[in-house]
C-alpha cells in the first residue's frame, strides 16, 4: 500500500467522498450512449470511465481490499 493509495482512501472514506464517487460512477461508468454516438464521444466517455475506475482501484487498495 502506497501513500497515494492511503490518500485516496482517506479522501473518499466519508459520506461526502462516497457521494462523489457514486456520482462519478453514475455519469461515467453507468452512462449509456445511444446508437448514434460518434467515435469521438465513445473515446471521450471511455477515457472518463478509465479515470473513475482508477480512482476506485486506488481507494480499494488504500483500504486494504
Segments (PLM) and residue ranges:
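Intrinsic-disorder/low-complexity detector
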Residues: 1-65
